[in-house]
Amino acid sequence: MNIAIFVSGSGTNCENIIRHFADHSDVNIALVLSNRADAYALVRAKKYNVPTVVIPKAEFNQEDKLMPLMQQYRIDFIVLAGFLLMVPGFLIDAYDHRMLNIHPALLPKYGGKGMYGMHVHEAVKAAGEKETGMTVHWVSRVCDGGEIIAQFSTPLSPDDTPDDIAAKEHILEQQHFPKVIEEVISNL
């Protein structure tokens, strides 16, 4: 199975996924795609000899740009790992229940447009939540609205800053995200 990982940022999850599947006989990380040429995730992918492609935001919604690329790399499954663009409907339809996303909160709380990265952790802090977590979900046409596949939580203390909350949530991502992907793929 050929997987494409879509990224916009530093790529810690991307690298973790690449490492997890490095010796997997049935899964190949075939492509890392970013909307940003300066995304450090591209450097991480190249370190493992994974092909990388940049499709600027202005071209990302163009079916004639994106779909031939998916066909060229024979992409069977897509993982959004810190990808900050809305995925176009034609791609969601083409990869129905074969595209998942990670979100840095316990959805449905703190999801939707504008809820990413530190914005989420600041909102969790402002609300005085007693726990935070991560959600892996299918990608749908509703931002962060797809069916939930898995959630993992961790307790918070009143003294936790948004940075502390982010660090706790990031540990969950590193521990669980690749395993959830593997489990989902094994059940396809």
Where are these regions (language model features)?
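One-carbon transfer enzymes
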Residues: 1-188
